[in-house]
Amino acid sequence: MKVVSYLKGIPGSNKNPEKPEVLKRFVQGVQVHGDVGIAHDGLYTPSDVAVLQGYVHEDSPHTPHLQLRKQVLDEQAKRNRRTIIVDSNLFLYLDKQNTKRYLRYSMDGVFPTTGNYFSDNPDPKRWLKVSQDLGIRTREWRTQGNHILICLQRNGGWSMKGLDN
């Protein structure tokens, strides 16, 4: 199996060492298991699995790193090959340096209808660990009394799938 991670899919202005590190370590893991792993610093090259740090949306700017991400996703899909997308920790606002190294991994997309988050068999204790690590407190769902549930996301977030906010 040939796995290629795309270092040029990271913005040139990036100052976060975690972004290239995760791509390089992914490749190291592939190599340890006897497969071909390449941390690639160029344009698209066919592979069994491509690895991207971050995703590209329909309305994303036409910058070189985002154009490469789009090309990788499109070419891999056209060849019926896989793409792993490594994306940011949803709770970065609580741990700006991501000291616990929480990241999101999906295959072939980031939307519920296009991506696979490998969540068919979730560990029921996982949320307890994440919430304890990051100091997140939630309340049980309440059916008595007057309560309002407000669900928010940033403009252009993935779950809107093109709908206006």
Q: Regions from the language model: what does each represent?
A:
Residues R25-Q28, K129, G162:
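Charged/polar, solvent-exposed surface patches and flexible loops
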Residues R142-N165:
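Conserved catalytic-core segment of nucleotide-activated headgroup transferases in glycan assembly
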Residues P17-K24, L66, K70, N165:
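Short amphipathic alpha-helical segment that frequently serves as the phosphate-/nucleotide-binding helix
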Residues T45-P46, R79, T143-Q144:
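Residue-level preference for short coil/turn positions at secondary-structure junctions
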Residues D59-I136:
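Active-site-proximal region of nucleotide-activated glycan assembly enzymes
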Residues S5-Y6, G37-H40, A50-L52, D74, ...:
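A structural signal for short, well-ordered beta-strand segments and their strand-loop junctions
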Residues M1, L128-I148:
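Nucleotide-sugar donor-binding and catalytic loop/hinge architecture
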Residues M1-D59, G156-G157:
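N-terminal pre-catalytic "stem/leader" segment of glycosyltransferase-like enzymes
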